[in-house]
Amino acid sequence: MAAALIPLPVRSRSAAGALRALLAGLVVACAAPGGAQQQAPGIPVAKPWDAVLVASFNIQVFGESKMAKPQVVDVLARVVRNFDIVAIQEVRAKSDDIVPSFVRAVNADGSRYNYVIGPREGRTSSKEQYAFIYDTNRIEADRASVGVVPDPQGRLHRPPMHARFRTRIVPVEMAFTFWLVDIHTDPDEVPQELDALTGVFQAMQAARPDEDDVILLGDLNAGPPEFSAFRRIPGITWAVSGVTTNTRRTKTYDNLVFTQPATREYLGRSGVLDLQAAFGLPLEHALEVSDHNPVWGAFYPAEVRQQALPPMAGQMPVQR
C-alpha cells in the first residue's frame, strides 16, 4: 500500500506548492546558466515547507586565509543559507574560531544557524575537521550522538564524523530523524576507503534499533561507476549521478549515499549548486571559493514508513 502524504503544519498545501512554483527555474545542478533571483539584504532565504534540504560541501582548505577574503565568505554564507543542513569537509585551520566565525557570517542576515564540529583528524601533520552547519529553525541536533566512527585498523585517513538530527517543521512525534555520516576520502586510497565505508555504513545502520535512516555524504573522490563496494549493501542508492561536482566541471566526487526503502523520505530531487552559474562567477573566482560545488538532496520532513513518496515537482532554491 502506498504511503499517504502526512499533512504538514503550513498555512496551506497550496502555499507550499506556490513556493515551489516560484522557485522553479532557478539555477540548480548543471543546468545551463540562468538568472537566479536576488535575495533582498537582511532577509533569510525562504525554504520549502514540504522538504528539508541536506547538502554536502568540501570547502577547500577552509581556514584563516579563506576567512580573510570577505567576498569568498559572502558566497559561502549564501550557499549555506540555501540549505537546512550542510555537511562540511576540509576545515583546515590552527584556530578553533573558523567555523564559529563563519556561522556568525551566515547569521548576519537574521538566519539562525548553529554547528557541530569534530576533532582534527589525519595521519599527517595536515589535519582536517568535519562540521555540520544547520538551520535551528528547521533542524535539531542530538549533541549526545556526535562522534567519530572508530577505525581501529586505520583503514581511513580521516574517519568519518557522525551525528543524528531531527526535523523541527512538523510535530515532534512525526519528525524525520536521521544519521548523517560526513566523510572526505583520501584520493590516493579511494578503493580501500570505499570498501571500509561499506562497513561504516552498515555499522551505523545497526547503531540504534530505532533509527534506520543513515545518509553518508561528503567528498568521496569517486563517482557512481566506482561504487562497486557500496553495491554490497542491500538497497543502496545515491542522490547525484550523471553530473559533475567539481568546480571545473570535469569530475564527480561528491554525493549523498543512503538505502531505500529505509530512507523513504528521499523525494527524488537532488542536484549540484554550480558556483559559477549560481553566483555569476568566472572560473578563477569560483575556485577561490572551493574546487568543489555543493551537492544536495531533498527529503520529506516527516517519517514515512511505507512505500516511497512520489518525486516532488519543481526545483530547489538557489540564492545569488
State what each model feature region is:
Residues 18-31:
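Bacterial N-terminal signal peptides
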Residues 2-6, 20, 246:
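N-terminal leader/presequence segments that precede the conserved core
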Residues 1-15:
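N-terminal secretory signal peptides that target proteins for export/translocation
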Residues 10, 14, 31-32, 299:
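N-terminal regions of proteins, emphasizing targeting and processing segments when present
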